[in-house]
Design a protein with these regions (language model features):
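Sec-dependent bacterial lipoprotein signal peptides
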Residues: 1-7
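Cystatin/cathelin-like cysteine-protease inhibitor module
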Residues: 7-111
Length: 111
C-alpha cells in the first residue's frame, strides 16, 4: 500500500512539474523525456532559501524571467523532486520543491 501511495504522489508531482515547465520554460515544445529520478520530502528549506532559489531562477536561460509562483503560505514540509529532461537533445537535471499538497511549485534550482 505504501508503494502505491508513493507512486501516486510521484505521478502527481510529475504532472505539476510538467505544467510548470509548459508555462515557464523558454522553449516548452523543445522539452522532452521528463523523468523523476528522486522523490522525497524535507522540512529544512526555509523562506530565505526559497527566496534565493526564486531570485536565481531569473538567471537560468532555459526558463522565462519573472516566474509567477502560486500565492499562499509556504508549508513547512515540502516535497522534493529531482528530475532529468532534455532540451534540443541536451540533458539537464533540476530539483523542484513542491508544497505539502503537491499542488504547486514553490521553487526550483538547477543541478
Amino acid at each position: 500500500m505504501l508503494l502505491s501511495v508513493s507512486c501516486g504522489r510521484q505521478h502527481q508531482a510529475k504532472g505539476v512539474i510538467q505544467d510548470f515547465i509548459d508555462q515557464y520554460a523558454a522553449e516548452p515544445s523543445a522539452c522532452s523525456s521528463i523523468s523523476i529520478v528522486k522523490f522525497d520530502s524535507t522540512q529544512t528549506v526555509n523562506d530565505s532559501i526559497i527566496g534565493r532559489m526564486r531570485a536565481n531562477a531569473d538567471t537560468i536561460q532555459r526558463y522565462k524571467k519573472s516566474i509567477k509562483y502560486a500565492d499562499g503560505a509556504i508549508s513547512k514540509k515540502l516535497f522534493i523532486a529531482r528530475i532529468t529532461y532534455t532540451v534540443n537533445d541536451a540533458e539537464y537535471s533540476d530539483t523542484y520543491y513542491l508544497d505539502d499538497q503537491i499542488s504547486r511549485v514553490v521553487a526550483f534550482k538547477t543541478n
